């Protein structure tokens, strides 16, 4: 038979039995379900073949789903006139599966059309539907379109409409029909729900669609409860869900208040209640709810959690993290009103003018009228004015530059708004008074001033920033608490905490401004301005949120991308503008202000207008998908390893919607040209079981039927989960089962009564709905193997599965990866499989021998582990033979340390005198070290930070997945052009152009790997401030150790891009009774260069010369013991191990108690057990575990990775070695 690369247990998509990789790669079920020779090009053909053989089992649900989808797709095409595209296909797939969901898609993606067709499809099947629109005009338009569609589709439809545009007679007739239940569909507005809910509640609706979720909340948040009841949710279920939500709210407040006892109580109570809720919901046959539109931040009421708790999804927010805006600025002239109107004339219609106060806005409108310009104010919503603006009758609208302004958040006209003008830099201006307190203003102030604070003041600022950030989601509750406190009303524990924090913030800011030294530092800083108006001090800081939201009106997502917009800031305050630029650049990598005079306005406006035309054509139906020849809104599922990475990626594109698939969270966002879902595999999804005897009997029987006897000579593949036949080798992988926080690879170990989490099934459940799956696992052989397993596991369900690779988790890197997918690299996969099989044969085999000989089941051995243990043992034993001493001497006021043998120490103790001679003094150029590789980072983490290697590796993983550093498993020192640009920005800003010296390092290295470096030009103090202030929002909470590790990565990288240092070096001979010791000391620095950031050669005082009396301060025997840092250096130098295994090897040695780790520098001292184990392995298996053989095997693996060695030949050689060197010992 043809040799499959691997076999997988429990993985046939149809029967759940074993299956080989070749079958999965062809999209086929196992050969038990379909015999060899079966051909299939799609899952539909597979299902047809299975049904013909009467073998259809696990794929039966897919058959029903595909049938429903095809019926819906044909129905859609018949009515609309063209096929569904991108996002519509995704929504249709969910709809026919009876799933409720949020529609995450931009203007022109066909949301309303889909909702109307889904409504007709439901009605055709005898189901009842309810459509809710935000306005009467939209409801009327949808109703008319629904009737047109019904006529086209030949659907007999009883449709009702109720809204304010109807006549009184029409309203009466509609209500009477509603009373009689004589309808299939009701089209109405969000205002109708609370007014007529008693009437509506008589009916259960099978399909409910809300065209604008935000409008539902504006009417009343209780509309959420009402919609759920209309879907069939009982009062009991609703009340249970509300209890869960209330407990969640209490839990968060208890966490904010620091009440740990209450947190624990609420946590336990909530877990029980959630389990009860899940049981109740499963008993109900609920209708389908489709929530269209995003939520304004202010609308994110906790009642929205009802959707998550009952329907399994969460509604997302607006994609304000996406922008395609040209940011320009110009200095304010003496007459800013005339300057503004001149800009309006130059830029044309479709403008918004943001002003700091109403008085200036009204003056601009009045002067515009005098000049014949059609400009109106929009300080409050004015429907007629907005409609005139949309029709092009007004050139611009004037509104307040505030995040609460109707023109900043309450307007979305992507086909109309072309540009915005900020008359003055948007800013917070406040006096430090309790009654003027604002969380955003104080957060901005504290973040911007922390850089001029030191010691206790900075600590207090950071603490307050953290407390205010945690209170920010409860801003309204905080204001209510302040009001209650001022009135002397009774306060809850949360109220008291909020009031205490606010008072502390106001008092602290006051104390800063009253401190003359700090006030002067603030006044001379470039981030905060203090202004004196009518004798009172005001604080001025940039309002970045308003700028982002306001300028974002010009750049909106639509079905085709992100429209281009223009923003012009008339700068009235250079200092506040500088702070605005700085913070904007930290939030958006691409953001950069250019002077208006340097911009090509004609080209910019041409690009802006091209997008507006496209948007209008889509909105008015003149541009259908086929006209472009491309699928504008493709649907993508990206699978990464960790939930942290998944959340980080999703958050690049706005506040994601959330879907829960069998306990696995999937984050959904729109990128403009795609609907992107991101989820995590939780690491590897397959592993070799410890023995085939420990898997399900049926699985084992099927394998035996295919491969025959598992034995091959004296080798029994059942013991190693690797089947060996004359025709080749077949590793057998089992699913990794997750149950109650534990992980299992053997079936028999799963606890009774526990239904394990099947990650692959959860991902399959979502993958079947999308067009494309992208596998975004780590860029190394381990990540490639995970991608390979996912590819095979999903292949029967999805035709288009590709691999994406990124070495940093940044928005730029993710977009580049999305645009450049590739296939799975089978050379990397094969190398990883060989490593795993080699470890199973050699490591597992040697471990069994050790366990038998030493009668200890906890012992282990491995090819890499053993020579590393040997270095530790040999070094330690050598130190016992040749004893030397560290001696610390004091001569005059200078201390020196020497290393001397015992006889010299005896002379020194007796005479207490040394002779010191200055041999030479020279200036020496010291070049910076290259940026970190994995081993170097771990060495410094151990030596400088006192962290263990495995803990440092976990911290680095967190930093990578949070988007703060590049990939941390690397042996490359190469720096990309993007990395050099980051270094340039930081170094020039901090130290000037002259210190910057770009180096790409590692020019001769192959591949795309790069050194470990930061992804942004922000040092650790800036990072701490940005995280505390909420400017940078991460998926995890950073600890002190995270910051420490980031700091050394940042400093090392920046140093690698700086000028060399020039130091003064003194060379001495120290003579003790004829024994001469040579010393070198750096005694001065002529030019700091890179050592400004990264001290490589600390300066020591010069030594006095001549014959000197000394005081012996201390001495001790030097036991030459390797530290973790020393071992890491040896592993890299001698080619033993890989970046991904360095820390793991050290961890295993300590875990098995072969060494114990002690001290800040993590010295590795061999134990008696460790020494005995090494001696045994060296004597019995010296050749097998020798350093040379281990290095050669590593070279084999590397050669497989790059396609220079054949997988089959290497694994055959390893098997031969195992059979000759290890197997005889096991047999005996």
UniProtKB/Swiss-Prot annotation:
<comment type="subunit">
    <text>Monomer.</text>
</comment>
<comment type="similarity">
    <text>In the C-terminal section; belongs to the type IA topoisomerase family.</text>
</comment>
<dbReference type="GO" id="GO:0005524">
    <property type="term" value="F:ATP binding"/>
</dbReference>
<feature type="zinc finger region" description="RG N-terminal-type">
    <location>
        <begin position="1"/>
        <end position="41"/>
    </location>
</feature>
<dbReference type="InterPro" id="IPR003593">
    <property type="entry name" value="AAA+_ATPase"/>
</dbReference>
<dbReference type="InterPro" id="IPR003601">
    <property type="entry name" value="Topo_IA_2"/>
</dbReference>
<dbReference type="InterPro" id="IPR005736">
    <property type="entry name" value="Reverse_gyrase"/>
</dbReference>
<feature type="binding site">
    <location>
        <position position="30"/>
    </location>
    <ligand>
        <name>Zn(2+)</name>
    </ligand>
</feature>
<dbReference type="GO" id="GO:0160097">
    <property type="term" value="F:reverse gyrase activity"/>
</dbReference>
<dbReference type="GO" id="GO:0003918">
    <property type="term" value="F:DNA topoisomerase type II (double strand cut, ATP-hydrolyzing) activity"/>
</dbReference>
<dbReference type="GO" id="GO:0006265">
    <property type="term" value="P:DNA topological change"/>
</dbReference>
<dbReference type="Pfam" id="PF00270">
    <property type="entry name" value="DEAD"/>
</dbReference>
<dbReference type="InterPro" id="IPR027417">
    <property type="entry name" value="P-loop_NTPase"/>
</dbReference>
<feature type="short sequence motif" description="DEAD box">
    <location>
        <begin position="211"/>
        <end position="214"/>
    </location>
</feature>
<feature type="binding site">
    <location>
        <position position="641"/>
    </location>
    <ligand>
        <name>Mg(2+)</name>
    </ligand>
</feature>
<keyword id="KW-0799">Topoisomerase</keyword>
<dbReference type="GO" id="GO:0008270">
    <property type="term" value="F:zinc ion binding"/>
</dbReference>
<feature type="binding site">
    <location>
        <position position="88"/>
    </location>
    <ligand>
        <name>ATP</name>
    </ligand>
</feature>
<keyword id="KW-0238">DNA-binding</keyword>
<keyword id="KW-0413">Isomerase</keyword>
<feature type="binding site">
    <location>
        <position position="12"/>
    </location>
    <ligand>
        <name>Zn(2+)</name>
    </ligand>
</feature>
<dbReference type="InterPro" id="IPR011545">
    <property type="entry name" value="DEAD/DEAH_box_helicase_dom"/>
</dbReference>
<dbReference type="InterPro" id="IPR014001">
    <property type="entry name" value="Helicase_ATP-bd"/>
</dbReference>
<feature type="binding site">
    <location>
        <position position="33"/>
    </location>
    <ligand>
        <name>Zn(2+)</name>
    </ligand>
</feature>
<feature type="domain" description="Toprim">
    <location>
        <begin position="635"/>
        <end position="809"/>
    </location>
</feature>
<feature type="binding site">
    <location>
        <position position="15"/>
    </location>
    <ligand>
        <name>Zn(2+)</name>
    </ligand>
</feature>
<dbReference type="InterPro" id="IPR013826">
    <property type="entry name" value="Topo_IA_cen_sub3"/>
</dbReference>
<keyword id="KW-0862">Zinc</keyword>
<dbReference type="InterPro" id="IPR040569">
    <property type="entry name" value="Znf_Rg"/>
</dbReference>
<feature type="domain" description="Topo IA-type catalytic">
    <location>
        <begin position="825"/>
        <end position="1223"/>
    </location>
</feature>
<keyword id="KW-0067">ATP-binding</keyword>
<keyword id="KW-0963">Cytoplasm</keyword>
<feature type="active site" description="O-(5'-phospho-DNA)-tyrosine intermediate">
    <location>
        <position position="967"/>
    </location>
</feature>
<dbReference type="Pfam" id="PF17915">
    <property type="entry name" value="zf_Rg"/>
</dbReference>
<feature type="region of interest" description="Topoisomerase I">
    <location>
        <begin position="631"/>
        <end position="1228"/>
    </location>
</feature>
<keyword id="KW-0863">Zinc-finger</keyword>
<dbReference type="Pfam" id="PF01131">
    <property type="entry name" value="Topoisom_bac"/>
</dbReference>
<dbReference type="InterPro" id="IPR006171">
    <property type="entry name" value="TOPRIM_dom"/>
</dbReference>
<protein>
    <recommendedName>
        <fullName>Reverse gyrase</fullName>
        <ecNumber>5.6.2.-</ecNumber>
    </recommendedName>
</protein>
<keyword id="KW-0479">Metal-binding</keyword>
<dbReference type="GO" id="GO:0003677">
    <property type="term" value="F:DNA binding"/>
</dbReference>
<comment type="function">
    <text>Modifies the topological state of DNA by introducing positive supercoils in an ATP-dependent process, increasing the linking number in steps of +1. Binds to single-stranded DNA, transiently cleaves and then rejoins the ends, introducing a positive supercoil in the process. The scissile phosphodiester is attacked by the catalytic tyrosine of the enzyme, resulting in the formation of a DNA-(5'-phosphotyrosyl)-enzyme intermediate. Probably involved in rewinding DNA strands in regions of the chromosome that have opened up to allow replication, transcription, DNA repair and/or for DNA protection.</text>
</comment>
């Amino acid at each position: 038979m043809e040799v499959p690369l691997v076999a997988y247990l429990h993985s046939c998509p149809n029967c759940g039995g074993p299956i080989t990789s070749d079958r999965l790669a062809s999209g086929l079920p196992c050969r038990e379900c379909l015999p060899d020779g079966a051909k299939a090009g799609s899952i539909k053909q597979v299902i047809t073949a299975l049904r013909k053989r009467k073998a259809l089992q696990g794929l039966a649900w897919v058959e029903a789903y595909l049938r429903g989808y095809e019926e819906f797709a044909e129905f859609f095409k018949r009515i609309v006139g063209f096929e569904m595209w991108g996002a519509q296909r995704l929504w249709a797939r969910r709809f026919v599966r009876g799933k409720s969901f949020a529609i995450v898609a931009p203007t022109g993606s066909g949301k309303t059309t889909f909702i109307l067709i889904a409504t007709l499809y439901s009605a055709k099947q005898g189901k009842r539907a309810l459509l809710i629109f935000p306005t009467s005009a939209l409801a009327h338009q949808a109703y008319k379109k629904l009737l047109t569609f019904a006529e086209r589709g030949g659907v007999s439809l009883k449709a009702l409409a109720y809204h304010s545009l109807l006549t009184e007679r029409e309203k009466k007739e509609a209500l009477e029909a509603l009373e009689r239940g004589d309808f299939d569909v009701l089209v109405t507005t969000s205002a109708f729900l609370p007014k007529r809910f008693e009437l509506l509640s008589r009916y259960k609706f099978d399909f409910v669609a809300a065209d604008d979720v935000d409008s539902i909340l504006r009417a009343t948040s209780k509309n959420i409860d009402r919609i759920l009841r209309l879907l069939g949710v009982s009062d009991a279920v609703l009340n249970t869900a509300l209890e869960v939500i209330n407990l969640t709210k209490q839990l968060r407040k208890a966490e904010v208040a620091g009440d740990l006892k209450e947190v624990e109580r609420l946590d336990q109570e909530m877990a029980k209640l959630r389990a009860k809720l899940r049981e109740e919901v499963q008993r109900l046959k609920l209708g389908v709810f489709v929530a269209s539109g995003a939520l304004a931040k202010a609308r994110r009421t906790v009642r929205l959690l009802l959707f998550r708790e009952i329907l399994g999804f969460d509604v997302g927010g607006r994609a304000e993290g996406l922008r395609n805006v040209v940011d320009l600025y110009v200095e304010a002239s003496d007459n800013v009103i005339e300057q503004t109107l001149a800009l309006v004339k130059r830029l044309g219609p479709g403008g918004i003018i943001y002003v700091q106060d109403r008085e200036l806005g009204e003056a601009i409108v009045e002067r515009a009228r005098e000049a014949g310009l059609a400009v109106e104010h929009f300080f409050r919503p004015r429907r007629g004015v907005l409609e005139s603006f949309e029709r092009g009758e007004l050139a611009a609208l004037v509104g307040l530059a505030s995040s609460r302004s109707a023109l900043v958040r309450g307007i979305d006209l992507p086909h109309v708004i072309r540009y915005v003008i900020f008359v003055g830099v948007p800013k917070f201006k406040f006096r430090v008074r309790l009654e003027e307190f604002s969380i955003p203003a104080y957060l901005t102030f504290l973040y911007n001033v922390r850089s001029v604070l030191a010691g206790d003041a900075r600590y207090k600022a950071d603490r307050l920033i953290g407390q205010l950030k945690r209170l920010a989601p409860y801003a309204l509750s905080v204001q209510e608490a302040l009001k209650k406190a001022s009135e002397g009303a009774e306060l809850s524990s949360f109220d008291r905490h909020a009031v205490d924090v606010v008072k502390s913030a106001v008092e602290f800011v006051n104390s800063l401004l009253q401190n003359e030294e700090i006030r002067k530092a603030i006044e001379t800083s470039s981030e905060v301005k203090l202004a004196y108006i009518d004798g009172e001090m005001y604080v001025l800081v940039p309002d970045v949120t308003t700028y982002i939201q306001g300028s974002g009106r010009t750049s909106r997502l639509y079905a085709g991308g992100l429209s281009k917009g223009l923003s012009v800031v008339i700068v009235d305050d250079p200092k506040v503008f500088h702070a605005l630029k700085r913070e904007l650049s930290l939030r958006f990598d691409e953001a950069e202000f250019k002077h208006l005079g340097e911009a090509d306005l004609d080209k910019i406006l041409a690009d802006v207008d091209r997008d507006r035309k496209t948007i209008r054509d889509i909105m008015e139906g003149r541009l259908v998908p086929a006209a472009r020849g491309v699928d504008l809104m493709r649907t993508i599922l990206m699978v990464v390893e960790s939930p942290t990475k998944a959340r980080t990626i999703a958050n690049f594109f706005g506040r994601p919607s959330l879907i829960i698939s069998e306990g696995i969270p999937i984050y959904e966002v729109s990128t403009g040209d795609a609907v992107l879902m991101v989820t995590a595999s939780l690491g590897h999804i397959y592993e070799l079981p410890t023995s085939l005897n420990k898997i399900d009997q049926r699985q084992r029987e099927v394998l035996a039927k295919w491969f025959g006897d598992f034995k091959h000579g004296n080798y029994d593949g059942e013991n190693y989960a690797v089947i060996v036949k004359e025709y080749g080798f077949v590793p057998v992988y089992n699913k990794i089962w997750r149950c109650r926080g534990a992980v299992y690879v053997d079936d028999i170990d799963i606890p009774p009564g526990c239904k394990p989490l099947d990650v692959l099934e959860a991902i399959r459940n979502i993958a079947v709905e999308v067009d494309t799956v992208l596998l975004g696992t780590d860029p190394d052989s381990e990540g490639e193997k995970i991608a390979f397993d996912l590819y095979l596991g999903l292949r029967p369900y999805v035709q288009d599965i590709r691999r994406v690779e990124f070495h940093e988790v940044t928005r730029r890197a993710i977009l580049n990866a999305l645009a450049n997918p590739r296939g799975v690299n089978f050379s990397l996969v094969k190398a990883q499989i060989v490593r795993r099989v080699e470890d199973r044969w050699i490591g597992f085999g040697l471990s069994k021998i050790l366990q038998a000989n030493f009668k200890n089941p906890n012992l282990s051995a491995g090819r890499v582990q053993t020579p590393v243990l040997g270095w530790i043992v040999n070094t330690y034993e050598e130190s016992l033979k040749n004893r030397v001493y560290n001696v610390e001497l004091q001569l005059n006021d200078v201390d020196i340390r020497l290393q001397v043998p015992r006889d010299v120490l005896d002379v020194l103790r007796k005479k207490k005198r040394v002779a010191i001679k200055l041999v030479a003094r020279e200036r020496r150029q010291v070049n910076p070290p290259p940026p970190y590789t994995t081993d170097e980072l771990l060495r410094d983490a151990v030596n400088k930070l006192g962290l263990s290697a495995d803990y440092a590796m976990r911290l680095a993983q967190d930093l990578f997945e949070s988007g703060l550093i590049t990939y941390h498993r690397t042996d490359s020192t190469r720096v990309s052009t993007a990395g050099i640009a980051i270094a340039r920005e930081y170094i020039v800003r901090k130290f000037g152009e002259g210190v910057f010296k770009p180096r790409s390092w590692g020019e001769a290295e192959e591949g795309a790997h790069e050194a470990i470096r930061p992804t942004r030009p922000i040092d650790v103090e800036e990072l701490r401030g940005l995280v505390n202030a909420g400017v940078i929002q991460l998926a995890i909470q950073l600890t002190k150790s995270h910051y420490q590790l980031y700091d050394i990565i940042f400093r090392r990288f920046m140093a690698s891009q700086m000028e060399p240092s020039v130091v003064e070096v003194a060379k001495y001979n120290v003579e003790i009774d004829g024994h001469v010791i040579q010393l070198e000391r750096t005694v001065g620095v002529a030019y700091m260069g890179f050592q400004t950031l990264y001290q490589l050669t600390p300066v020591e005082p010069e030594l006095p010369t001549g014959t000197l009396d000394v005081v012996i301060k201390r001495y001790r025997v030097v036991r030459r013991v390797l530290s973790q840092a020393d071992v890491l250096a040896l592993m890299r130098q001698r080619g033993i191990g890989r970046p991904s295994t360095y820390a793991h090897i050290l961890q295993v040695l300590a875990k098995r108690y072969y060494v114990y780790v002690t001290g800040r520098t993590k010295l590795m001292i061999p134990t008696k057990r460790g020494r005995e184990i090494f001696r045994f392995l060296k004597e019995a298996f010296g050749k097998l575990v020798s350093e040379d053989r281990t290095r050669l095997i590593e070279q084999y693996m590397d050669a497989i990775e790059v396609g220079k060695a054949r997988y089959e030949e290497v694994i055959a050689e390893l098997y031969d070695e195992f059979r000759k060197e290890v197997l005889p010992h096991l047999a005996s």
